Amino acid sequence: MNLIDQIESEQLKLDLPSFSSGDTIVVQVKVREGERERLQAFEGVVIAKKNRGIGSAFTVRKISHGEGIERVFQTHSKMIDSIEVKRHGKVRQAKLYYLRSLTGKKARIKEKLQLKK
């Protein structure tokens, strides 16, 4: 195994839930304010996901006070404390950039119902 691959595999987080585009998630982010460190929740819809090993990232979009806010998170970053999947969305595309131009009820995503086994 390559030395770079070995170092990258040690840095990967293994406790991540499986989520995809269209899912509504809550990301707990560590925020430093002076000497204090606290957790800040960022809840929104995943509009893009990039799987590139240690360089994996995902983009989350939410509407706050009528303004759309997008934030790109590095999947294996130490600044991410936890990721919780609230609901799975039913979408047919991998990148949901078209949601940027939609507002109100048009921007809603149907929920994907899971069959229990």
UniProtKB/Swiss-Prot annotation:
Function: This protein is located at the 30S-50S ribosomal subunit interface and may play a role in the structure and function of the aminoacyl-tRNA binding site.
Gene Ontology BP terms: translation
GO molecular function, one term: structural constituent of ribosome
Organism: Ruthia magnifica subsp. Calyptogena magnifica
Keyword Ribonucleoprotein: yes
Family: Belongs to the bacterial ribosomal protein bL19 family.
NCBIfam families: rplS_bact
Covalent S-S links between cysteines: none
Pfam families xrefs: Ribosomal_L19
Family matches, as InterPro entries: Ribosomal_bL19, Ribosomal_bL19_CS, Ribosomal_bL19_sf, Translation_prot_SH3-like_sf
Keywords: Ribonucleoprotein, Ribosomal protein
Protein's name in the database: Large ribosomal subunit protein bL19
TM ranges: none
One of the record's GO cellular component terms: cytosolic large ribosomal subunit
Keyword check for Ribonucleoprotein: yes
